[in-house]
Amino acid sequence: NYLSGTVSVDKKIIDIMTPNYDRIIEIICDKLGIGVITGFYGSLYGKFSRNLLKQPTEVYNCKNYSWIRLFKPHGSINWISENGKEYLTNDYEILKEKAEYIEIVTPGSSKYKVGMTNNTFRCMREEFNELLNPRDNYSLLIYGYGFNDDHFDTALFDSFQKNVLILSRDVKPDIINKALEKKNITVFYHEDDREYMIYKSKKYTIDMPVWDINQFADLFIG
């Protein structure tokens, strides 16, 4: 509901960053008829192009069709890296056969290092961070993110100069404190068996879990 109501005639490309490596966003977009720009080109063995991710309008028809530009800086379960070659494939048999070569950043002590040294991961992160440039005028939606990733937290905190909407069941105290200090940050969250909203630096108790994206879409988009 949220995706179909957000991609509109006014903005044909919506930018999404996810630290998750599942394909839920891609599947939902397919069902909604929304194209997904991943930075990879090709059908069976997709190859990564930074310019395709950076300048999608040079390749895709972004005037007549709706698109999601998807940044996956921790990799994806359909990315394969083998013998120095990297490609994207949606062929289940290939993914099953090459399971040990699936390219994702798993939780652990080497997480930050891998994200810095892998070229595709680094490009994904750098291009998304560029979108967070404080000089640009836009609003930012953060959904279900726990602010536990050093790669993005600094850039996200800098972007808090803009209008920011945070939907997350669990929110760290320092994020809540920032919302109480800055009127441009709105937060919906759950704490101590209650639902809360922080809006224009004031905290309210509410009667429904608006941090849930479906509840949010039903309430504000319909």
Explain the meaning of each model-derived region:
Residues 3, 61, 93, 102, ...:
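Compositionally biased, intrinsically disordered low-complexity regions enriched in proline and serine
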Residues 2, 24-31, 72, 120-127, ...:
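Amphipathic alpha-helical segments that form well-ordered structural scaffolds
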